[in-house]
UniProtKB/Swiss-Prot annotation:
First-level EC class: lyase
Keyword match Lyase: yes
Gene name, Swiss-Prot/TrEMBL: trpC
Molecular functions per Gene Ontology: indole-3-glycerol-phosphate synthase activity; phosphoribosylanthranilate isomerase activity
PANTHER family from the UniProt entry: INDOLE-3-GLYCEROL-PHOSPHATE SYNTHASE, TRYPTOPHAN BIOSYNTHESIS PROTEIN
Record's protein name: Indole-3-glycerol phosphate synthase
Reaction catalysed by this enzyme: 1-(2-carboxyphenylamino)-1-deoxy-D-ribulose 5-phosphate + H(+) = (1S,2R)-1-C-(indol-3-yl)glycerol 3-phosphate + CO2 + H2O
Entry annotated with the keyword Zinc: no
Pathways per UniProt: Amino-acid biosynthesis; L-tryptophan biosynthesis; L-tryptophan from chorismate: step 4/5
Keyword annotations from UniProtKB, A to Z: Amino-acid biosynthesis, Aromatic amino acid biosynthesis, Decarboxylase, Lyase, Tryptophan biosynthesis
Gene Ontology biological process terms in this record: L-tryptophan biosynthetic process
Length: 262
């Protein structure tokens, strides 16, 4: 595991330990189970694709470790409503505080501002974080193969599915893909950004495509900046996209989404 990812995960472990002291997992689980409002994340992507349109997961993030602050004028509710008005299938909201300047409140506010399903984008390593995600309103969680063992991945996926949530599993190379293909979720994210070097290559997705069986919905992540990038992926059968930076840097995120997929 690379240094940046290891550092983030160490912070996450501390965050979970602190959160558990403030609120028990049993209490949090009761709150999560009491919510009967899951929005179908994978289904929303499929519905958009069935209309002949790309399934865009539009991301809400203020900053990143590699790029710094992406958007000074940041209002999660406003951005979410703009995305929904311009054809996004789903939202992705960063909830990491230390590295991405995100928050749980951003997710709550984004979800309240529109009818779209929401992914909690964070570095998840403990069931507590998944239960917390559902309690705050998330409909889907991200599991990163580079950060977890195969056993952890299966166990965390089961926790999410028991709560009615979808799971987006993220890979970057062939070895990680082989692990991910053993999971139940149909949502397979391919991150074009190398978490070790932060270099971004769209070929990462294209090179892994031949190894992916039918029944998996590929979501290409990172480096989708221009309409040409979307068209390239669609020509190769990739119909789902997770895009953040290109939208966050634009004056009007929703309008940039519409331009990207036009």
């Amino acid at each position: 595991m690379n240094d940046i990812l290891a550092k983030i995960l160490a912070v996450k472990a501390e965050e979970v330990a602190t959160a558990r002291q403030m609120r028990s997992e049993a209490e949090l689980l009761r709150e999560a189970q009491a919510r009967q409002d899951v929005r179908g994340f994978a289904q929303a992507i499929e519905d958009k694709i069935a209309q002949g349109k790309p399934g865009v997961i539009a991301e809400i993030k203020k900053a990143s470790p590699s790029k710094g602050v992406l958007r000074e004028n940041f209002d999660a509710s406003e951005i979410a409503a703009s995305y929904a008005a311009h054809g996004a299938a789903c939202l992705s909201v960063l909830t990491d505080v230390q590295f991405f300047q995100g928050s749980h409140d951003n997710l709550r506010r984004a979800r309240a501002a529109c009818p779209l399903p929401v992914l909690r984008k964070d570095f998840i390593l403990d069931p507590y974080q998944i239960i917390s995600a559902r309690a705050m309103g998330a409909d889907c969680v991200l599991l990163i193969v580079a950060a977890l063992s195969p056993t952890q991945l299966r166990d965390l996926e089961a926790v999410a599915m028991d709560l009615g949530m979808d799971v987006l599993v993220e890979v970057h190379d062939e070895a990680e893909l082989d692990v991910a293909l053993g999971m139940k979720t149909p949502l397979l994210g391919i991150n074009n950004r190398n978490l070790r070097s932060f270099e971004t290559r769209l070929e990462t997705t294209l090179n892994l495509l031949p190894r992916i069986p039918a029944g998996k919905r590929v979501v290409t992540e990172s480096g989708i900046l221009q309409p040409d990038d979307v068209q390239l992926m669609r020509r190769h059968g990739v119909q789902a996209f997770l895009v953040g930076e290109a939208f966050m840097r634009a004056e009007e995120p929703g309008a940039e989404l519409a331009r990207l997929v036009a």
